[in-house]
Amino acid sequence: MRRITMDPEMNTSISSIRSQEILDSRGNPTVEATVLLDCGITGTASVPSGASTGIHESQELRDNDPKRYKGKGVLHVVEKSIPAIETLLKGMSVNDQRAIDRNMIELDGTPEKKVLGANAILAVSLACARAGAIASDIPLYTYLRKIYWPDVAGWILPVPQMNVLNGGKHAPGSVDMQEFMIMPVKAPSFVEALRMGSQTYHALKSLLLEKKLPVGVGDEGGFMPKVSSHEEMLTVLVDAIRLAGYEPGNDIVIGLDPAASEFFENGAYMLKTENATLTSSELIAHYQSWTEKFPVVSIEDGLSEDDWDGFVDMMKKMGDRVQIVGDDLFVTHPDRLTKGIELHAANAILVKLNQIGTLSETADVISQARQAGLKTIISHRSGETEDAFIADLAVACNAGQIKSGAPCRIERVAKYNRLLHIERELQSSSQFATFSFLR
């Protein structure tokens, strides 16, 4: 991060906000915002977009002009929403992040942020935080810690959940379930965890080539081979871990994100790969079987986003030994998280900034989950940019886990490289989360 010479009289009021339509990693438009302060400092941020989105998420604003980007353009955000936000925030101190976010929420006036667009609001929210950190002459993770988690002690570098085999909406033509992830939990540091993950990724590629399976990659950098079953995907993954020289279940464990809402049709789970139609109980039985055969320790969105009874049943049957993660179930929303806590529907939450649409609301959900004893995983989206904000966020709140895709494609690797830099900055004052953070 660029260092500056601090001036006690520095004016950190917001002078102007600029924005631009840029492309995300899937070639679709997204929003980049730059906040300029009176003192001359700027902060820039860009926002991601999901493919398998929960129906309860905040709403992005798109142009819906079929002549531009098949309707996915964001010129309305750039030309209308951001100028309206600029008028609102001009003259405010960039250091008052909660007031900035609150004012944007009130200006929009809808729970889904559908007037200004969650993509407009979040871009400005993150850009303000970045400008505030630069103006304060401290790293972004330290700045976020001071604002939202001042009582949290120590610095934890997160275990990466690396999506090395892709299916579902991230990889058309592969299996139904979306993500098969490796988690290098035995590493002594993040730098070693990244090495272990990368070496396993390359071992996996070699194994797929040996089996004459395709090695093209999906949206998140994982391979998307055409195999006959989900168990075959898991078998290949375990073989790759061994080929890389690691012990499955000890050095490296496996996480799944089935994204079950995407194959939930007419009240049943349709696994076209196996030509099977399953009830919630039958799908849970599949998961139970897999955790016995393979070192699967985390299952995210194993059931559809409104299958609350199914999640409760899954927790009763597996929650004592498996991390049951709510993503589409919770959509980083306090009300849905409250319901999940009351029902005991999950023991972990996936946190995505653009699901709720402001930094402050995201931070509050993280704190709510922590207070209830849920594990927290900070996550990217399938349509990403080079912005590595989530790396700083994961360290700021001591999340202990982060999802940023495979160690492939620069928009994924940018987050991992940022964590390398943070670990080097913190040196002996930080520790790696390791397997204990899953318990």
Predicted regions and their residues:
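Short, Gly/Pro- and small/polar-rich lid/capping loops
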Residues: 4-31
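Short beta-strand elements
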Residues: 21, 31-39, 43-49, 162-184, ...
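Conserved phosphate/anionic-ligand binding catalytic regions in large, soluble enzymes, centered on
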Residues: 22-24, 29-33, 112-135, 159-175, ...
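Conserved active-site and cofactor/substrate-binding residues in soluble primary-metabolism enzymes
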Residues: 28, 72-80, 92-102, 119, ...
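Structural signal for hydrophobic packing residues in well-ordered secondary-structure cores
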Residues: 37-41, 82, 86-93, 104, ...
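Metal- or metallocofactor-binding catalytic centers and their adjacent structured scaffolds
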Residues: 48-138, 147, 194, 222
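Mobile "lid/hinge" segments at catalytic clefts and subdomain interfaces of large enzymes
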Residues: 56, 149-150, 155-221
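Catalytic core of soluble alpha/beta enzymes
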Residues: 231-439
